[in-house]
Design a protein with these regions (language model features):
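Conserved HGGG/HGGXW glycine-rich cap/lid loop of the alpha/beta-hydrolase fold
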Residues: 1-35, 215
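Conserved hydrolase catalytic core segment
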Residues: 66-104
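Flexible "cap/lid" loop of the alpha/beta hydrolase fold
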Residues: 96-135, 165, 231
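Conserved loop-alpha-helix segment in the C-terminal half of the alpha/beta-hydrolase fold
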Residues: 166-197, 218-219
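Short beta-strand/loop motif that positions the catalytic acidic residue
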Residues: 155-157
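Active-site loop/oxyanion-hole signature of alpha/beta-hydrolase fold enzymes
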Residues: 24-70
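Catalytic active-site module of serine/aspartate enzymes centered on a nucleophile-bearing elbow/loop
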Residues: 191-246
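Active-site nucleophile elbow and catalytic-triad environment of alpha/beta-hydrolase enzymes
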Residues: 124-145, 176-184
Length: 246
């Protein structure tokens, strides 16, 4: 998960680490705690969810981290996590999506709002090299990808309105579109949908205990599912690893 730079350590990492191993990484172009760019290798911007999934796959292979993983992702990272799960279904045992963006925004925003949202995501950022995202290419690719179903999943949705498209007006309708898109996403994944979060977009910073509880719930469900399968086939229970996406 990407953590606002004002926090030096994501508060949920050490807590989650008490019940499962946590692996976190800095996506190329994300910022450190002081607002400077992370030390990750720079990539061409804007980037797509498909490129993000490929980077994550290469990272896990390079770090020799064996799955299956429970992927935890925030905002744009939600598209990356779902793309990864679609491309590597045997490697993913659960999803925790924290106020995720999704392709369903194209259905709930007006065409003009969607175009503005896509252009906003692709805008060059300062300093040079900071992450810009290509929803216009990522959304149709994710729609065409095999659906991710049959694994424990939780979607956490902000219940405090935030400015999705600054300086365009209609903030309340935009917030409604964001929530409707998350309704569609949760239904698409057959996921538990938690909408009473007492948070804006950065749920992981504003309500970390809820994120921790959701991760625990998905990890335990993934373990039960894995144990049932192992007991049936081999009589041994395997506990999945967890990967937390920053």
């Amino acid at each position: 998960m990407r953590v606002p730079h004002r926090r030096r350590v994501a508060p949920q990492f050490p807590q989650v680490g008490k019940f499962i191993r946590v692996c976190a990484y800095d996506r190329p172009g994300t910022t450190r705690f002081d607002g400077t760019l992370s030390p990750s290798t720079t990539v061409k911007q804007p980037t797509t969810a498909q490129e993000g999934a490929a980077d994550l796959h290469a990272l896990l292979r390079g770090a020799k981290q064996k799955g299956p993983y429970v992927l935890v992702a925030h905002s744009w990272g939600g598209l990356i996590a779902r793309q990864y799960a679609s491309e590597h279904p045997d490697e993913v045992s659960g999803l925790v999506l924290v106020d995720p963006a999704s392709e369903f925004l194209q259905d709930t925003l007006t065409p003009a709002q969607w175009d503005a949202f896509v252009q906003l995501g692709k805008q060059p950022r300062e300093p040079e090299g900071i992450e810009a995202v290509d929803y216009g290419s990522s959304a149709p690719a994710l729609r065409a990808a095999p659906p991710v179903r049959g694994i424990p999943s939780v979607v956490l949705t902000s219940d405090e309105c935030f400015e999705l498209l600054p300086d365009t007006g209609g903030a309340e309708r935009q917030c409604q579109a964001w929530r409707e898109a998350q309704d569609l996403l949760a239904a698409h994944l057959d996921a538990e949908h938690i909408t009473h979060t007492d948070s804006g977009h950065a749920i992981q910073a504003e309500n970390p205990e809820l994120v921790i509880a959701s991760v625990r719930e998905v990890v335990e469900a993934a373990r039960r599912k894995s144990c049932a399968l192992e007991d049936k086939n081999h009589g041994q229970c395997h506990k999945p690893e967890k990967h937390a996406q920053r």
